[in-house]
């Protein structure tokens, strides 16, 4: 029991469970005895009915639309805390990770487009390598233990949070279907209620979650991706402490283990099951997977390192205390672990086009993320062991 408690208390545990979930999905999707069960599980219909309201989705879509909204709620809470009290609370503190994140989104997207611009279908996946998997990246960093400077961990956390915020904006602007004005009106009303609750000082988290459920349903029906509702709710839950209690921090504390040990692993299990049947060298070297691998493995560290260098060169920001530029480059490589966030964007980009494209995209994401994890870990380990 003591060893189990120590495992779940470590920062690496979430990343390790993600790896196990993804490996299990790959195994089950490619074994004759289990592949049928795996796909049947994902296609299981689940119906929710409340009065006249009815939502019919298969298990995969419930995981991607509903459970991932809880993940984005946690992201919203973390972003709000960092903006108001943490590493993004002042312009001077925020400048370096913000500039790094911008470079880490622009360059991978451009590199992907260099491979896929001529194909109007695969071109839609330009945002896939722009994302970073916070849990996985922090998990790999945690494998190096106390040798990693605290400032470097905070930098990676801040960079990944801004990265996810950028991914949220990209999803809202570029990956929405036909919009329902009525549903958007209901969503706007729900947001107004959340704002009113916050202004009136309502501190009961359950009230925000209840209104958030209405918002999620309205956003789902509107054509905008439903997970965005989670971020919005997170922004409105009060952060300020009263009698030593903060509703936002308390909810963040409650949600974190559920997200790390259930929701993200379940998402990985549901989405990482790529069939290797029919995989050929020609397929692996086609523009879609190559663009994703290049974007994650080369574009991410190149964009982050280049923009950080420019920020330092023109004195727009400074290195986090106790870190070196070589260590920042290593963190840039780790940010190429797109995994869950990249798979999520791939499902939005190609979900209504061709299942084969999603399969190739996932394969590219898995290869690019794995290579980024191995190279980033090795590079940072060498930099930490190097004499100052």
UniProtKB/Swiss-Prot annotation:
Q: Which UniProt keywords apply?
A: Antiport, Cell inner membrane, Cell membrane, Ion transport, Membrane, Sodium, Sodium transport, Transmembrane, Transmembrane helix, Transport
Q: GO CC annotations?
A: plasma membrane
Its placement in the membrane is given as: Multi-pass membrane protein
GO molecular function annotations of the record: sodium:proton antiporter activity
- Predominant location category: membrane
Q: Which Pfam families match?
A: Na_H_antiport_1
What biological-process GO terms show up in the record? regulation of pH
Q: Where are the transmembrane segments?
A: 14-34, 59-79, 95-115, 125-145, 154-174, 179-199, 219-239, 254-274, 292-312, 328-348, 360-380
- The lineage's top-level taxon is Bacteria
Which reactions is this enzyme annotated as catalysing?
A: Na(+)(in) + 2 H(+)(out) = Na(+)(out) + 2 H(+)(in)
Compartments annotated for it: namely: Cell inner membrane
The similarity annotation says:
Belongs to the NhaA Na(+)/H(+) (TC 2.A.33) antiporter family.
Checking PANTHER family in the record gives:
NA(+)_H(+) ANTIPORTER NHAA (PTHR30341:SF0), SODIUM ION/PROTON ANTIPORTER NHAA-RELATED (PTHR30341)
Function recorded in the entry: Na(+)/H(+) antiporter that extrudes sodium in exchange for external protons.
In Swiss-Prot or TrEMBL terms, this protein is called Na(+)/H(+) antiporter NhaA
**Protein's organism:** Salmonella typhimurium (strain LT2 / SGSC1412 / ATCC 700720)
């Amino acid at each position: 029991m003591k060893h189990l408690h120590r495992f779940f208390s470590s920062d690496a545990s979430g990343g390790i469970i993600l790896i196990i979930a993804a490996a299990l999905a790959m195994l089950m999707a490619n074994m004759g005895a289990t592949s049928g069960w795996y796909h049947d599980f994902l296609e299981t219909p689940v119906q929710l009915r409340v009065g006249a309201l009815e939502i019919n989705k298969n298990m995969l879509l419930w995981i991607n639309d509903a459970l991932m909204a809880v993940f984005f709620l946690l992201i919203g809470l973390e972003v709000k805390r960092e903006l108001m009290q943490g590493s993004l609370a002042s312009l001077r503190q925020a400048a370096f990770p913000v500039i790094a994140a911008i470079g880490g989104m622009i360059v991978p997207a451009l590199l992907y487009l260099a491979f896929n611009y001529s194909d109007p279908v695969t071109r839609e996946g330009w945002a896939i390598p722009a994302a970073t998997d916070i849990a996985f990246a922090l998990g790999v960093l945690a494998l190096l233990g106390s040798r990693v400077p605290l400032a470097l961990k905070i930098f990676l956390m801040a960079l990944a949070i801004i990265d996810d915020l950028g991914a949220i904006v990209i999803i809202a602007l570029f990956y929405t279907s036909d919009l329902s004005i009525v549903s958007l009106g209901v969503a706007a009303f729900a947001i107004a209620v959340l704002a009113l609750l916050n202004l009136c000082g309502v501190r009961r988290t359950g009230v925000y979650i209840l209104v958030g459920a209405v918002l999620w349903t309205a956003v789902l029906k509107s054509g905008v991706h439903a997970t965005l509702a989670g971020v919005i709710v997170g922004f409105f839950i009060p952060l300020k402490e009263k009698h030593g209690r903060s509703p936002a921090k308390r909810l963040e504390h409650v949600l974190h283990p559920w997200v790390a040990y259930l929701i993200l692993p379940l998402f990985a299990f549901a989405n990482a099951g790529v069939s290797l049947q029919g995989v050929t060298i020609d397929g692996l070297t086609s523009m879609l997977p190559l663009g994703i691998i290049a974007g994650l493995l080369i574009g991410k560290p190149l964009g982050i390192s280049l923009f950080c260098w420019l920020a330092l060169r023109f004195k727009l920001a400074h290195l986090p205390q106790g870190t070196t530029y070589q260590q920042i480059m290593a963190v840039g490589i780790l940010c190429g672990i797109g995994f869950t966030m990249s798979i999520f964007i791939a499902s939005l980009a190609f979900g209504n086009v061709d299942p084969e494209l999603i399969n190739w995209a996932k394969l590219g994401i898995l290869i690019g993320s794995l290579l980024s994890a191995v190279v980033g870990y090795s590079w940072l380990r060498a930099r930490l062991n190097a004499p100052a």
